């Protein structure tokens, strides 16, 4: 999962499936014929993306896998973070993953299929045993864009503190090649509750996402079968597989409310949710889950980068999802270098209505306050130093991830200036930041231009004493400053 340096542009959501180790999502949602089947009333799904919480970082050697975790017999949780080696972290809650890390998987011996590292991608309880699905790399020369990927199965009898390798379960059709990323890997695994485990994997040679499955009764080496040309009939070891469609990522889960498989992926404007009722044919939610601007993998850069996103259940930490999810991802803030990397957990609440809902997706706008910097920061993004030194002050409604359908809306940007001698974060209309010499950080989202049912006003305010802008739902700016203008109307809930 290491990535070769290079000047090329990558979009801000990255999925580890392409030739250099990451998949740069296209600028348009694309469809090659496989992404076609519709979920029952996909327009009836309502999603609210909540507060981001930074659990680990900054550090360069974290968050290089799809984060995975299990619940322990005592009710606590054990998460697994990887960066060549895999580390176990214990916490009281699924998102409480800031504690000490201990190494549980290491790079293999020279010449082995895991000589460059073992990244635990998914931990699956099976009785008192934990199944570990491990991403491996060998023949790596990361500075030249070269590595060779595969997946193996390991088991643990002590809840992930030690592992026994049972061998490879998924390999590609190609061999290690100088200057190229080859093989198949970066898989996530889920129990389809139909007697099969399903794997969704990246194939670097063509940027494809592919599927394989194995019986729950025996998911070991030689029992995985890939999906190829409409059938499950190609061996997991060395067999061919059909691409499931452009725009998909390899981060999968199962939504227990309807039994559907859910993949994260890319659609126009941001990170998307894709649903399937047959494990192989996916349809996207019409609105992005998160708004994401184009980003640059090579750091530092003015853009931000989200990588290795995965969905976990907010109560159990597994990937059998209730209606309360966590979106977990690696994060590089704008203008920061590679060493400023964070692991972020974000609440996502999902529900199904009996009729179509508009808008479907809303992302929480939170306001943080750092008294030492005299900075109030109204943002939809993760805030380095969240909870200390930045304290959560209030929540100001939800921003839409696309322009309001059929109704005038306003696109808002998140930006910052250092002119007062400290950060002055500003939420403003698109174009305002550059016109007023603020550094643009990101697209924050959209608000309605006029009041709509279940919306709240959103004002841009200014505190003259602190020389700090902020957003508020109150016309008197909660007596923290004075209103400069009405930005629009955010979703109330």
Where are these regions (language model features)?
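Bacterial N-terminal signal peptides that target proteins for export
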Residues: 1-11
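Secreted/luminal cysteine- and crosslink-motif detector
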Residues: 21, 42-45, 117, 141, ...
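Beta-rich carbohydrate-recognition and catalytic domains
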Residues: 26-116, 125-178, 193-249, 255-301, ...
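Conserved beta-strand position repeated once per blade in WD40 beta-propeller domains
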Residues: 66-69, 120-122, 186-188, 250-252, ...
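Acidic/His-rich structured neighborhood in mature extracellular/periplasmic domains
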Residues: 179-183
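Extracellular glycan-binding segments that recognize GlcNAc-based cell-wall polysaccharides
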Residues: 358-493
């Amino acid at each position: 999962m290491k990535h070769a340096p290079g000047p090329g542009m990558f979009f801000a959501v990255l999925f580890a499936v392409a030739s250099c180790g990451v998949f740069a999502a296209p600028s348009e949602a694309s469809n090659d014929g496989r992404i076609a089947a519709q979920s029952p009333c996909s327009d009836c799904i309502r999603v609210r993306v909540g507060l981001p919480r930074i659990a680990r970082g900054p550090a360069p050697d974290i968050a290089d896998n799809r984060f995975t975790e299990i619940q322990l017999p005592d009710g606590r949780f054990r998460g697994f973070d990887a960066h060549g080696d895999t580390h176990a972290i214990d916490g009281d809650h699924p998102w409480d993953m800031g504690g000490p890390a201990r190494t549980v998987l290491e790079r293999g011996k020279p010449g082995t299929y895991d000589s460059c590292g073992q990244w635990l991608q998914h931990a699956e309880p099976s009785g008192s045993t934990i199944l570990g699905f491990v991403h491996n790399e060998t023949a790596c020369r990361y500075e030249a864009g070269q590595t060779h990927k595969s997946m193996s199965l390991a088991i643990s009898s002590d809840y992930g503190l030690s592992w026994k390798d049972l061998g490879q379960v998924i390999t590609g059709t190609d061999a290690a090649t100088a200057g190229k990323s080859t093989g198949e890997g970066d898989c996530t695994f889920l129990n389809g509750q139909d007697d099969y485990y399903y794997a969704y994997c990246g194939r670097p040679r063509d940027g494809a996402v592919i599927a394989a499955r194995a019986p729950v009764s025996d998911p070991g080496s030689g029992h995985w079968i890939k999906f190829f040309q409409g059938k499950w009939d190609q061996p997991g070891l060395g067999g061919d597989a059909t691409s499931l469609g452009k725009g998909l990522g390899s981060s999968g889960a199962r939504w227990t409310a309807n039994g559907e498989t859910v993949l994260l992926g890319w659609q126009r404007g941001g990170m998307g949710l894709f649903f399937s009722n047959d494990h192989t044919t996916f349809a996207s939610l019409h609105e992005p889950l998160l708004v994401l601007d184009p980003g640059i993998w090579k750091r530092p850069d003015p853009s931000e980068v989200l990588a290795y996103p995965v969905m976990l259940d907010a109560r159990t930490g597994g990937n059998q999802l209730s209606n309360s999810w966590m979106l977990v991802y690696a994060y590089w803030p704008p203008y920061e270098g590679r060493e400023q990397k964070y692991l972020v957990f974000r609440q996502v609440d999902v529900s199904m209505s009996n009729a179509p809902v508009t808008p479907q997706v809303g992302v929480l706008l939170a306001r943080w306050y750092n008294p030492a910097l005299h900075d109030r920061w109204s943002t939809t993004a993760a805030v380095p130093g969240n909870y200390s030194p930045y304290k959560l002050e209030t929540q100001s409604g939800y921003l839409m991830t696309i322009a309001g359908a059929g109704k005038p809306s306003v696109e808002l940007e998140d930006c910052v200036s250092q002119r007062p001698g400290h950060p002055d974060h500003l939420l403003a209309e698109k174009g305002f930041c550059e016109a007023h010499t603020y550094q643009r950080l990101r697209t924050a989202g959209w608000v309605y231009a006029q009041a709509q049912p279940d919306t709240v006003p959103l004002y841009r305010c200014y505190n003259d004493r602190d020389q700090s802008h902020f957003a508020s739902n109150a016309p008197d700016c909660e007596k923290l400053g004075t209103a400069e203008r009405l930005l629009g109307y955010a979703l109330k809930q």
